[in-house]
Every structure is written in C-alpha cells, then in structure tokens.
Regions:
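Glycine-rich phosphate/diphosphate-binding loop of Rossmann-like nucleotide-binding domains
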Residues: 1-45
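Short, high-confidence coil segments that cap the C-terminus of an alpha-helix
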Residues: 61-63
Length: 117
C-alpha cells in the first residue's frame, strides 16, 4: 500500500525549521512491510496549496496520507480548515476535550493562546 507524508508549515519551506516529523513517521511506516512511503511533500501554510497537494495525492494511487504540521493555535495554522474545506465538512469543537485542555494548561501554569479553539 502506498503512503504519502505531507509536512505543512512556512517555517519548513523557508528553512527556519528542520522537518524531523516526516522522517520519524517514515521510519515508523517502514516497520510495516505492507506499507511503502512513495511521496514526502512539504507545503506552506496556504489553504489552496494544501488542498491542491491533497487532491494530487488522492488522485495518484496513494492509499494513506499522513499530515503533520499546521495544527497549532496560531493564526497561520490552517491545516484543519483546509481539510474541512477540501472534504466539504464543518469543524466541530469537542467541548469536553477543550475543557480538559484548559484545565491542563491551568494546572501546568501554561498560558494558552487566545486563539485556542
């Protein structure tokens, strides 16, 4: 089965951050003999670029896509919005999990971003 890994982030594209996630994921995937990593793609934080790459992969014999990056709480983390748009789905807030996160951050004395959704 063919696998693609998509790493998302402007910081990866411009070289300010090294993409270690896709290497780790690829190493874990090759432990399974029936899976073959056939594509690793880096995409900037752009909804249209994410959707375009996803469309290409889904139409080119890829069985599984692993996506990493763009899932934080800052304004440029738009992976979930891009996926919701691509699959014509709506994002739903899991209130109980959100409350657990808030409690975790409070107990650890970590200030959460106001953009945490």
């Amino acid at each position: 089965m063919n696998v693609a890994i998509v790493s998302i982030g402007d910081e990866l594209m411009n070289g300010f951050t090294t993409d270690t996630n896709s290497s780790w994921i690829a190493r874990k995937i090759v432990e399974y003999q029936s899976l073959d990593v056939v594509s690793k793609v880096t995409v900037k934080d752009d909804i249209d670029d994410i959707k375009c790459n996803l469309d290409y992969l889904l139409n080119n014999n890829i069985d599984y896509i692993f996506i990493t990056g763009g899932l934080g709480s800052t304004h440029d983390d738009i992976t979930k919005e891009a996926l919701a748009d691509y699959f014509n789905s709506e994002l739903v807030l899991n209130s109980s999990y959100y409350l657990r996160l808030k409690k975790y951050f409070k107990n650890k004395k970590i200030k959460s971003k106001s953009t945490l959704k």
